[in-house]
């Protein structure tokens, strides 16, 4: 049986003499054509594919000794199967059933007693153990066959691995040599460059496909060996299990029949013996009683005969004697009856004790009989379950056989594909050799272009700053709000709208003229740019974007919107398309593109308002009491030229979407109130401070700047707003800070060295000290209303903007760390 199982196992295992020898011949033929690898590396050619320093990860994936987490080696699977079968084949040992203690096992303990009592040996245990030993021996033989096959597969996989390593190192050798020179750049350079990229990508794909095919081949071999080993082990296990169950079943039937027969025989013998003993005892008692009665009767008769002849003589004396004897007779009879009843009672007690003893002896036999019946039922259920398992194993085995056949066909197709791929790799190697000179020159030219690009970026920053200085470090843009149908429109003209719009004309009634139309006067104002009502925020930001670039180059930039309430300042600065979100989006996009040139930027945002000369953090969390405990004060670092505010919330800006959240949070916390000019008038100056920190890892350059985007409160005069109470106090504080802003700008434009600049006259100018002076670039938006009723305030705003536009401040300096 063992020899036949071994032959069937070895016949079902995959034979590698043909397929693996063919793989070895293909590997030897291919590796003989690959020269020894000589790797050349070039630190500047970062885009050229380099050989992998270690193939340990791929080797570990290809080694058949390491199995997937969900698949056991055939040996281990066979051992598990055999051990489980052995456990099922040893039902007479206490260890096979963990729920039953060794001393109380029904079969192991009582089979011996039954055999000793009835003279019948229990031989099924040794036969079942021999069957399990046969299963284990077949499992060991299947493992030896599988280990031989595994060593052959491992050698084939190592050959394939060495072949792949040689291909990669040869390709790396050729790729490292491909460094073209700029003097020999051919006309079709771009075509070859694209072709090389395609070849590199194709080679990488084929390499991954080869690795996957090798891994699939190894897994297929393992699964096939496992399936065959499991099939043989399952067959042998099922056969031994069936033999064991049949023997156990027949033995149990024989034992049950024997026990029932012996039990009936014992019961019958005990009953007969008991009846015989009772009959003997009763007959003995009766004989003794009869003998005693006869003795007494004989004595009485003899006495009567002895004294009868004296009765007549001694009548009186005999009567007395007769009465005495009669009493003695009665007492003797009473004693005899009492002795007989006591003897009967003793016999009955002895009978009861014997009956109880027999019943106690019968009860274990009945319990043993019931236990044997339960064991038979359990064995029948196990036999049924094992039959189901057998059927499942048969179906699984058929499925595994079909899968093995599919894998064999797939393996053959993969071997042909590998051969084709090897030929393609050889062809690609020749093509790479042809393109070696082109790649070498292209790489050198690329390095030169990178250096040139870095130099041009530095030059661009200088030229950009020069252009901005020529335009003026303080500039003024005028923007007219589009009419919203809320009143009569004023006469506003844009004479040079078709060219670089820089002039705005307003027709209004001159002061002191009559209402008949006499004294109409035309007012003209010139600024750096003038935007008509049709201009969108995107168009405005296109003009503004150059200053945002200056902020990224390391210059402090201050942009603020000035104008009366309702002139469109908040829409210009804080709407979804306003200057604040557009500026942040531009910085993000620009910083992403500058990463190729070595620049990295970090951004932090702060949002505050100045209300009645008090700084309020618009991003602070908590209730009003907690916010009031934080004291916000302005500190200036003279050496670094930097302004900081204590206890203010600073939010790192990692995405442009965070700016939208900042604007929403600030809008909820900003102070607004209804006035005569606007139902929702901003009663404070809002300041968005964006701190930029840039560094270039290639050149070692660093820059730091602050971008201030300010939405000033309404600039209408007290005579126009007619504010009272709390609104009056707010208007006075707003006008004071705006007046101080004009004084600072005027002092900066005086040009006299040592001139006192009144920064500390207001919180606004004190905060913007390093963003308004010669170390910065300033842009003022003057927003005006298109309504006729607002013309006086419009003229006042335009005159203030003209003063600012006529101011010249010093040259801005770049802030470095």
From Swiss-Prot:
Chain intervals for the UniProt region annotation (Disordered): 1-155
Alphabetized InterPro entries for the sequence: Kinesin-like_fam, Kinesin_motor_CS, Kinesin_motor_dom, Kinesin_motor_dom_sf, P-loop_NTPase
Keyword Nucleus listed: yes
Gene3D superfamilies linked to this entry: Kinesin motor domain
Recorded coiled-coil stretches: 155-242
Keywords: ATP-binding, Coiled coil, Cytoplasm, Cytoskeleton, Isomerase, Microtubule, Motor protein, Nucleotide-binding, Nucleus
Annotated SUPFAM superfamilies: P-loop containing nucleoside triphosphate hydrolases
EC number: 5.6.1.4
GO terms of biological process kind: cytoplasmic microtubule organization; establishment or maintenance of microtubule cytoskeleton polarity; karyogamy involved in conjugation with cellular fusion; meiotic centromere clustering; meiotic spindle assembly; meiotic spindle formation (spindle phase two); microtubule anchoring at mitotic spindle pole body; microtubule bundle formation
Biased composition regions of type Polar residues, renumbered to the chain: 39-60, 106-116
GO molecular function: ATP binding; ATP hydrolysis activity; microtubule binding; microtubule motor activity; minus-end-directed microtubule motor activity
CC terms in the record's Gene Ontology section: astral microtubule; cortical microtubule; cytoplasm; cytoplasmic microtubule; kinesin complex; kinetochore; meiotic spindle pole; microtubule
Reaction equation(s) it catalyzes: ATP + H2O = ADP + phosphate + H(+); ATP + H2O + a kinesin associated with a microtubule at position (n) = ADP + phosphate + a kinesin associated with a microtubule at position (n-1, toward the minus end)
PROSITE patterns given in the database record: KINESIN_MOTOR_1 (PS00411), KINESIN_MOTOR_2 (PS50067)
Limits of the Kinesin motor domain: 473-807
Subcellular location: Cytoplasm, Cytoskeleton; Cytoplasm, Cytoskeleton, Spindle; Nucleus
Location (main, coarse): cytoplasm
Keyword match Chloroplast: no
Comp. bias (Low complexity): 8-23, 76-86, 122-132
Binding site residues for ATP: 473, 475, 479, 543, 566-570, 778
Assigned protein family: Belongs to the TRAFAC class myosin-kinesin ATPase superfamily. Kinesin family. NCD subfamily.
The protein's role, per its UniProt record: Minus end-directed microtubule (MT) motor that is involved in spindle microtubule shortening, kinetochore capture, and polarization of cytoplasmic microtubules. During mitosis, promotes spindle microtubule shortening by depolymerization. During metaphase, involved in the recapture of kinetochores displaced from the spindle and their transport towards the spindle pole body; promotes transport both by microtubule end-on pulling and by lateral sliding along the side of the microtubule.
The name this protein goes by in its record: Kinesin-like protein 2
Taxonomic source organism: Schizosaccharomyces pombe (strain 972 / ATCC 24843)
Higher taxonomy: Eukaryota, Fungi, Dikarya, Ascomycota, Taphrinomycotina
Gene it is expressed from: klp2
């Amino acid at each position: 049986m063992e020899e036949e199982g071994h032959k069937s196992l070895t016949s079902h295992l995959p034979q590698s003499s043909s397929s693996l020898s063919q793989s070895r011949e293909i590997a030897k033929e291919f590796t003989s054509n690959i020269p020894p690898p000589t790797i050349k590396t070039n630190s500047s050619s970062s885009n050229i594919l380099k050989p992998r320093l270690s193939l340990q990860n791929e080797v570990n994936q290809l080694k058949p000794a390491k199995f997937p987490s969900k698949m056991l080696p055939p040996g281990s699977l066979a051992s598990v199967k055999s051990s489980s079968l052995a456990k099922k084949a040893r039902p007479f040992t206490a260890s096979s059933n963990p729920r039953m203690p060794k001393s109380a096992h029904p079969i192991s303990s009582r089979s011996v007693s039954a055999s000793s009592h009835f003279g019948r040996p229990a031989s099924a245990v040794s036969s079942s153990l021999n069957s399990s030993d046969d299963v284990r021996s077949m499992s060991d033989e299947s493992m030896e066959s599988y280990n031989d096959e595994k060593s052959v597969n491992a050698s084939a996989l190592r050959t394939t691995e060495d072949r792949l390593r040689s291909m990669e190192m040869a390709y790396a050798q050729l790729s490292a040599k491909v460094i073209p020179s700029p003097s020999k750049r051919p006309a079709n350079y771009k075509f070859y460059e694209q072709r090389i990229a395609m070849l590199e990508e194709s080679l990488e794909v084929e390499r991954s496909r080869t690795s996957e095919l090798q891994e699939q081949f190894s897994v297929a071999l393992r699964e096939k060996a496992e399936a065959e080993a499991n099939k043989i082990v399952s067959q042998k296990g099922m056969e031994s299990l069936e033999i064991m169950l049949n023997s156990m079943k027949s033995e149990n039937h024989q034992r049950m029949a024997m026990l029932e027969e012996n039990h009936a025989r014992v019961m019958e013998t005990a009953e007969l013996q008991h009846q015989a003993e009772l009959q003997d005892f009763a007959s003995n008692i009766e004989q003794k009683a009869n003998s005693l009665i006869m003795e007494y009767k004989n004595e009485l008769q003899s006495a009567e005969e002895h004294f009868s002849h004296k009765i007549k003589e001694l009548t009186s004396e005999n009567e007395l004697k007769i009465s005495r004897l009669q009493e003695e007779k009665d007492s003797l009879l009473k004693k005899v009856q009492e002795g007989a009843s006591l003897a009967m009672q003793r016999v009955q007690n002895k009978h009861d004790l014997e009956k109880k003893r027999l019943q106690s002896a019968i009860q274990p036999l009945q319990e043993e009989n019931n236990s044997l019946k339960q064991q038979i039922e359990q064995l029948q259920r196990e036999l049924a379950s094992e039959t189901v398992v057998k059927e499942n194993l048969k179906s699984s085995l058929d499925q595994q056989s079909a899968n093995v056949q599919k894998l064999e066909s797939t393996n053959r197709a993969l071997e042909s594909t590998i051969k084709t791929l090897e030929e393609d790799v050889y062809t690609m190697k020749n093509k790479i050799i042809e393109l070696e000179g082109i790649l070498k020159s292209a790489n050198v030219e690329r390095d030169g272009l990178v250096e040139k690009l870095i130099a041009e970026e530095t030059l661009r920053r200088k030229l950009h700053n020069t252009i901005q200085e020529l335009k003026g470090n303080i500039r003024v843009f005028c923007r007219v709000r589009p009419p919203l149908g809320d009143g009569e429109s004023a006469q506003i003209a844009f004479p040079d709208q078709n060219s670089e719009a820089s002039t705005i004309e307003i027709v209004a009634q001159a002061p002191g003229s009559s209402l008949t139309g006499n004294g109409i006067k035309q007012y003209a104002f010139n600024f750096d740019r003038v935007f008509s009502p049709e201009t969108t925020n995107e168009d405005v930001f296109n003009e503004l974007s150059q200053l945002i670039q200056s902020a990224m180059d390391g210059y402090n930039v201050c942009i603020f919107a000035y104008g009366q309430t309702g002139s469109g300042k908040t829409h210009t600065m804080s709407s979804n398309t306003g200057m604040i979100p557009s500026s942040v989006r531009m910085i993000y996009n620009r910083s992403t593109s500058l990463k190729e040139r070595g620049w990295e930027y970090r951004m932090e945002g702060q949002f505050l308002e100045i209300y009645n000369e008090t700084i309020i953090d618009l991003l602070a969390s908590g209730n009003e009491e907690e916010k009031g405990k934080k004291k916000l004060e302005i500190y200036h670092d003279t050496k670094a030229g930097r302004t900081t505010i204590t206890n203010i919330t600073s939010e790192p800006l990692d995405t442009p979407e965070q700016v939208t959240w900042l604007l929403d949070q600030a809008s909820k916390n900003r102070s607004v109130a209804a006035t005569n000019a606007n139902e929702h008038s901003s009663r404070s100056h809002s300041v968005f401070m964006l701190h930029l920190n840039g560094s270039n890892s290639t050149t070692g350059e660093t820059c730091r700047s602050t971008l201030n985007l300010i939405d000033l409160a309404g600039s209408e005069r007290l005579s126009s707003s007619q504010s009272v109470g709390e609104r009056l106090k707010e208007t006075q504080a707003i006008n004071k800070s705006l007046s101080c802003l004009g004084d600072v700008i005027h002092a900066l434009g005086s040009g006299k060295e040592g001139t006192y600049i009144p920064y500390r006259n207001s919180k606004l100018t004190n905060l913007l000290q390093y963003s308004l002076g010669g170390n910065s670039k300033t842009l003022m938006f003057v927003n005006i209303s298109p309504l006729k009723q607002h013309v006086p305030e419009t003229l006042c705003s335009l005159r203030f903007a003209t003063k600012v536009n006529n101011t010249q401040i010093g040259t801005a300096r770049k802030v470095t760390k």
